[in-house]
């Protein structure tokens, strides 16, 4: 009793010595918490974040364990000889759906097609500057692997190379890439045909071209300042999907290349051939000649 009174001088201790000690400890803890409150809050926030992360990981692991357990509980599947056939059938059905989507997407473009009993027959239409040109078809058989049954693509178009790169993995990419080749070829051929038919009086020799129309050479004449000048041109189309040349060489027989007037004409003609369709270049030459004649008359 004396011990208790010593710990509680002047008043009675409620609950005994242990209770009094607990109260003192609680008061001390409160005081400490007040002094450490900012650090504690920061630590608590960090712990809450960590707890959330751990709970997310726990939930994820629980889901994986549950999924794995369901698989383990499943009875072993019996060998089904038709399983492979069904799987292949599903793949083919998916290919059919892809083809339908392609036909719908290309309804208003240069590509169109119709479904056949074996697959789809695609029609690839070409055009240049609003002029409809030749059309080609590719008959595809929808099976694994996809294959080309018939086609009307010219032999100099690398159809097999394009098919090997894209047909089995991306049919749309295959068709678009093939269209690029065919459309560029048709555009180059159209320009050469226009030059021969509409500007034959300007050509001083035959237009030479290869089957792909990616190499053209010709000689032509241009009237300037009451004089007629002859030029030779060589146009190379290194990009098979381009309708304009990548390399142009213009020469003039018997004239020094270093001559300033000649160099100016050469550079001007080369720039025109690189940036404009062939027949439009010669149309501009004709307009310049007409202007010159009008100026002389007036």
UniProtKB/Swiss-Prot annotation:
Q: Does the keyword Cell inner membrane apply?
A: no
Keyword Methyltransferase assigned:
no
Q: Where is the composition biased (Basic and acidic residues)?
A: 33-49
Q: Which UniProt keywords apply?
A: Centromere, Chromosome, Coiled coil, Kinetochore, Nucleus, Phosphoprotein
Sequence segments annotated as region (Disordered): 29-49
Which Gene Ontology BP annotations are present?
centromere complex assembly; chromosome segregation
Q: What does the UniProt record say this protein does?
A: Component of the CENPA-CAD (nucleosome distal) complex, a complex recruited to centromeres which is involved in assembly of kinetochore proteins, mitotic progression and chromosome segregation. May be involved in incorporation of newly synthesized CENPA into centromeres via its interaction with the CENPA-NAC complex. Modulates the kinetochore-bound levels of NDC80 complex.
Recorded protein name is Centromere protein O
């Amino acid at each position: 009793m004396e011990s208790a009174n010593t710990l509680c001088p002047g008043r009675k201790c409620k609950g005994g010595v242990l209770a009094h000690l607990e109260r003192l400890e609680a008061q001390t803890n409160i005081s400490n918490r007040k002094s450490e409150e900012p650090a504690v809050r920061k630590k608590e926030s960090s712990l809450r974040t960590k707890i959330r992360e751990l709970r997310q990981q726990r939930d994820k692991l629980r889901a994986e364990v549950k999924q794995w357990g369901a698989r383990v509980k499943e009875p072993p599947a019996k060998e089904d000889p038709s399983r492979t056939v069904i799987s292949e059938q599903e793949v083919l059905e998916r290919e059919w759906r892809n083809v339908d989507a392609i036909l719908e997407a290309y309804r208003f473009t240069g590509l169109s097609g119709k479904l056949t009993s074996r697959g789809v027959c695609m029609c690839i239409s070409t055009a240049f500057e609003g002029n409809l040109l030749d059309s080609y078809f590719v008959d595809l058989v929808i099976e694994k692997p996809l294959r080309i049954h018939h086609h009307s693509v010219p032999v100099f178009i690398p159809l097999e190379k394009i098919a090997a790169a894209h047909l089995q993995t991306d049919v749309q990419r295959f068709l678009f890439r093939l269209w690029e080749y065919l459309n560029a070829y048709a555009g180059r051929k159209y320009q050469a045909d226009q030059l021969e038919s509409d500007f034959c009086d300007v050509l001083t020799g035959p237009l030479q071209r290869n089957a792909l129309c990616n190499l053209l050479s010709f000689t032509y004449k241009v009237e300037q300042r009451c004089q007629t000048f002859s030029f030779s041109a060589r146009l190379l189309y290194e990009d098979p999907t381009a309708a304009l040349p990548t390399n142009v060489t213009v020469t003039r027989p018997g004239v020094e290349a270093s001559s300033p007037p000649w160099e100016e004409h050469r550079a001007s003609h080369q720039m025109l051939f690189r940036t404009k369709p062939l027949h439009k270049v010669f149309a501009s030459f004709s307009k310049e000649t007409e202007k010159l004649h009008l100026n002389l008359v007036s």
